[in-house]
Amino acid sequence: MAKIIYLPLEHIDMRYTVYLDKVITNYLESSKIEFIKIYPNIPKREIKEGSFLDAPTTIEFKSKQIAKVAEMYHTDQIKSGDIIFTSDIWFPGLESIAYLNYFCNKEVKLTGFLHAGSFTDTDFVRDMERWAKNFE
């Protein structure tokens, strides 16, 4: 039976990320859906005033999630039919899933929420459209 590999956002107390992870985890558990949650242990760092995240910490967190996913492909813990779900698809490095699917000869689906992006005029990542539009 297919399972979900859940890649949550890192917890940032002043944002919605802790609540969102709790809601998603509770739903998966109460629905008795088989899932593996990949939540790397990284040190909490202070977010600079005027920012809503710390970019280096975010990239470290997501990179460790992708590294764990790659290990799971290598050890055949991820199988065709499984689903990788992320609570935010705006996730640099997520294109690695297509790479892993191709070279590991697996059909693993990728899904998740896309809260905003370079296509959103009011989002700060609008300035990243030059490279982000092909990623999104």
Task: For each feature predicted by the language model, list its residue ranges.
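N-terminal pre-catalytic "stem/leader" segment of glycosyltransferase-like enzymes
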Residues: M1-S96
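Membrane-proximal helix-turn-helix segments that form the acceptor-binding/catalytic region
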Residues: R126-E136
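Glycine-rich, flexible loop segments associated with nucleotide phosphate handling
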Residues: I59-S63, C104-V108, E136
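Glycine-rich loops and low-complexity Gly/Arg-rich segments
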Residues: E29-K32, V108-G112, N134-E136
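Active-site proximal beta-strand in glycosyltransferases
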Residues: I83-W90, Y102-D123
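Short, solvent-exposed loop/turn segments at secondary-structure boundaries
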Residues: Y16, D123-R126
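Alpha-helical scaffolding within the catalytic cores
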Residues: A98-L100
